[in-house]
Amino acid sequence: MAKHEMEDRGDGLVEKMISVNRVTKVVKGGRIMAFSALTVVGDGDGGIGMGKGRSKEVPVAVQKAMEQARHNMMKIKLYNGTVKHTVEGRHGATRVLIQPAKDGTGVKAGGPMRAIFDAMGIHNVSAKIHGSTNPYNVVRATLDGLSKINTPAQIAAKRGLSIEDILGVGHE
């Protein structure tokens, strides 16, 4: 069950809860019930982190997940509130396709991807999930895809060209 709650603690980070599941560990004496939480934390300017927490109580599991997400933050370079180019991310049986969108399009993404884009500050993007829609796999695949975004400087260095050649600046 995907539940997207938004919080702001005053440190400028946006916290979103992706899912909370009841999990069971079977031992010799019976079953031990616990809760597992999956969260993302973003700074609204391209920063994003994912965390998982597990505890016997929901609030403690969510708190652990938020702390882990803050610890696992990474920075993605945004371009006018969207991604610079189309990317594909994979994790397990999940494949996500993330495409840039024109200004005014909004976030066309389902499930946990919407929460990630909102926390990051991406306002115009189109995304599609192929394969498994397990929230954990979708979050990991989305972060994998976002980490593959290249800046024009990286593309120019890889091709051995100048940035002006890549962007077409000055050519008519």
UniProtKB/Swiss-Prot annotation:
One of its GO terms (molecular function) is rRNA binding. PROSITE patterns: RIBOSOMAL_S5, S5_DSRBD. It comes from the Bacteria. It holds the Pfam family Ribosomal_S5_C. GO terms for biological process: translation. GO terms for cellular component: small ribosomal subunit. Residues 13-76 form the S5 DRBM domain. Keywords: Ribonucleoprotein, Ribosomal protein, RNA-binding, rRNA-binding. InterPro entries: Ribosomal_Su5_D2-typ_SF (IPR020568), Ribosomal_uS5 (IPR000851), Ribosomal_uS5_bac-type (IPR005712), Ribosomal_uS5_C (IPR005324), Ribosomal_uS5_N (IPR013810), Ribosomal_uS5_N_CS (IPR018192), Ribsml_uS5_D2-typ_fold_subgr (IPR014721). Signal peptide: none annotated. The keyword Hydrolase does not apply. The keyword Ribosomal protein applies. PANTHER family: MITOCHONDRIAL RIBOSOMAL PROTEIN S5. With S4 and S12 plays an important role in translational accuracy. Located at the back of the 30S subunit body where it stabilizes the conformation of the head with respect to the body. Part of the 30S ribosomal subunit. Contacts proteins S4 and S8. The N-terminal domain interacts with the head of the 30S subunit; the C-terminal domain interacts with the body and contacts protein S4. The interaction surface between S4 and S5 is involved in control of translational fidelity. Belongs to the universal ribosomal protein uS5 family. This is Small ribosomal subunit protein uS5.
